[in-house]
């Protein structure tokens, strides 16, 4: 009897292990990880505790000085859902350096893009933010709109509005980073805009787009879309300058960026090899 029970246990555990290697199993692992982080961060938020990894928000000027930059330099924002992180990069010596990483208290939905109004899904993709997209009087303390839907989203019939980065720890499709963190982010982005940066790029990813992370999720419904995102991610990783992002025939296309193009809006443009232009 004991041998039979042991055999049954081995079969059950083996079957579970095999399931976790499937795309559905990987999705389950990701959902468990996301929900555990959400529960932890929301409990800390309600208790008035800082979230793990929060920068020293009381000494931003000293941190800027230590980084060798001043308030008002151009900025670039990256968001990673799975890791619950928002990064601020600042321009220094002809490229961008990471200045701070802020924990995202809450984002809603699952890994994957936003599809339609009301799906409570946080966007993924390439966006830009100008001064008109900032709201200093938001119900969520301060906020800026990502500009969803962009041209890519529109080409795929995706709908939605008021998709923000904001304070607090509540979300119906936004990225909530707490009031103290959004105050610092606000100072950095408004400082850059006030000093002449026309807009700043915000690139939102499901996770850090490494080869290993993509392999783990091979077979996902979104692996083709994520492969497009990875191309833009890799260009930045190589140069630490945001790439030029365009939309061609419903797909993202990229070109290596320069400091002069780092603030470019996402436009509808096909490269010559696609259009046949000389």
Feature roles, as predicted:
Residues 177:
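A conserved hydrophobic position in a structured secondary element of the catalytic/binding core
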Residues 2-172, 180-278:
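N-terminal pre-domains immediately preceding structured catalytic cores
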């Amino acid at each position: 009897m004991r041998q039979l029970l042991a055999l049954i246990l081995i079969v059950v555990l083996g079957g579970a292990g095999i399931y976790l290697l499937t795309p559905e199993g990987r999705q389950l692992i990701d959902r468990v990880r996301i929900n555990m982080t959400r529960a932890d961060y929301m409990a800390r938020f309600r208790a008035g505790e800082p979230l793990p990894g929060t920068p020293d928000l009381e000494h931003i000027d000293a941190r800027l000085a230590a980084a060798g930059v001043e308030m008002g330099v151009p900025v670039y924002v990256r968001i990673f859902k799975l890791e619950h992180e928002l990064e601020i990069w600042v321009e220094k010596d002809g490229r961008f350096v990471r200045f701070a990483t802020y924990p995202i208290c809450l984002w809603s939905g699952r890994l994957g893009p936003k599809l339609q109004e009301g799906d409570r899904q946080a966007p993924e993709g390439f966006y830009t933010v100008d001064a008109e997209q900032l709201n200093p009087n938001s119900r969520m303390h301060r906020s800026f709109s990502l500009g969803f839907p962009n041209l890519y989203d529109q080409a795929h019939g995706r709908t939605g509005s008021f998709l923000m980065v904001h304070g607090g720890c509540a979300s119906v499709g936004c990225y909530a980073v707490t009031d103290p963190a959004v105050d610092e982010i606000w100072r950095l982005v408004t400082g850059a805009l006030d000093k002449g940066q026309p807009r700043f790029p915000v690139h939102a990813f499901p996770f850090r787009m490494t080869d290993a992370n993509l392999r783990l999720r091979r077979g996902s419904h979104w692996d083709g879309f994520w492969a497009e995102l990875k191309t833009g991610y890799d260009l930045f990783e190589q140069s630490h300058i945001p790439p030029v992002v365009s939309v061609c025939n419903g797909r993202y296309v990229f070109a290596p960026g320069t400091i002069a193009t780092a603030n470019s809006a996402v436009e509808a443009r096909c490269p010559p090899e696609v259009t046949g232009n000389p």
